[in-house]
Amino acid sequence: GTALAMEHNGDVYSCDHYVYPRYQLGNILNRSLGEMVNSEFQRAFGKAKADTLPRYCRECEVRHLCHGECPKHRFLRTPDGDPGLNYLCRAYKRFFNHSAPAMQRMAALLRIGRAPAEIMRQAA
């Protein structure tokens, strides 16, 4: 619940996929962004996002990367038959598992004080 959306007129919403009157947190012209992010409504929005994840997602090895993604995209069933699986789940898993070795190499470079961009020379 921390990726808010702001419209051109300053209206702020819980998420860019929920730009509906029900999810309007306020307007940046008359309410601080901090107030909106930390509002009870927004905290409940974020909590519901986590609380509605099916067990398949809660036990997933890449959940820390996608967090179940957007609730609007959770319209498939898990292999166990539970509702709430993100329709991009399989692609996310493939991407994160494919890119993990490169991410780990970049993290190792950072730990020794080198630029992660050096990985580009290693890949060439």
Regions found by a protein language model. Name each.
Residues E69-F75, D80-D82, A100-Q104:
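Short cysteine/histidine-rich zinc-coordinating motifs and their immediately flanking basic loops
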Residues N30, N38-F41, P71, F75, ...:
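A generic structural signal for secondary-structure junctions
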Residues H17-E61:
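C-terminal accessory region of radical SAM enzymes
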Residues F45, P83-A124:
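Short Fe-S-cluster ligation motifs
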Residues S14-H17, L53-H73, R90-A91:
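Local cysteine-cluster metal-coordination motifs and their immediate loop/turn environment
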Residues G1-P21, L53, L65, R114-A124:
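A C-terminal junction/extension of Radical SAM enzymes
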